[in-house]
Amino acid sequence: MNIREWPAEERPREKLLQRGAGSLTDTELLAVFLGSGVRGRNVVELSRGLLVKFGSLRRLLEADREAFVGELGLGPVRYSQLQALLEIGRRHLATSIERESAMDSPAAVRRYLKAMLRHEASEVFGCLFLDTKHRPLAFEILFRGTIDRASVYPREVVRRALVHNAAALILCHNHPSGISEPSQDDVHLTLSLKRGLALIDVRVLDHIIIGDGEPLSMVEHGWIVA
């Protein structure tokens, strides 16, 4: 059935306008984004099929370009639109952290860092720079690729800390494998960075690792001491 023949309250776009985006299912949200279906499948049927194919909305959103554009009903235009939409969301989240108030809990920090890194298909390393009251100054991704002592340069982390006049920082990186437990390289890298930053009186408060589940705090698990 053509979606235009549905009752108005059941059409995804009208439902969103009447009840808000939070009332929509993943299928309906994707249908609103796609806008139209393909021959023989309305947009809701297309959306449902895509979610089945990719396994979840998250996996669809995190799919690489080749996998995304190869699906019927998708393509480079929709891929670029989706990437722009995701980046808008990330930037909105970043700017929503008010500099005037410190992050109110370690859990809030972990949620923020997970939102900033979980979409990355490859390994990345970043820093959340903080002032003397542990209020956020800036978040930056500094390195991409395999994260180990050979690819993360302490002098660059020190330089960025000086640029932001940071008094403390929180290190973070993701594990695309989904496993959050730190490797020996992760531990050694963290200790090396702590020593380097101590020379300019900048404290490393934690190193957060982002995987599929809850973000892991190396301090809370005893791998390092703040």
Curated annotation (Swiss-Prot):
Q: Where is this motif: JAMM motif?
A: 173-186
From the UniProt record, list the coiled-coil ranges.
none
Q: Which PANTHER family does the record match to this protein?
A: DNA REPAIR PROTEIN RADC, UPF0758 PROTEIN YEES-RELATED
Question: Which GO MF terms does the UniProt record name?
Answer: metal ion binding; metallopeptidase activity
Looking up Pfam families in the UniProt record yields: RadC (PF04002), UPF0758_N (PF20582)
Q: Determine the domain of life of the protein's source.
A: Bacteria
Q: Sorted alphabetically, which keywords does the UniProt record give?
A: Hydrolase, Metal-binding, Metalloprotease, Protease, Zinc
Q: Give the UniProt record's GO annotations in the biological process aspect.
A: proteolysis
Q: What is this protein called?
A: UPF0758 protein Pput_5194
Biological source species: Pseudomonas putida (strain ATCC 700007 / DSM 6899 / JCM 31910 / BCRC 17059 / LMG 24140 / F1)
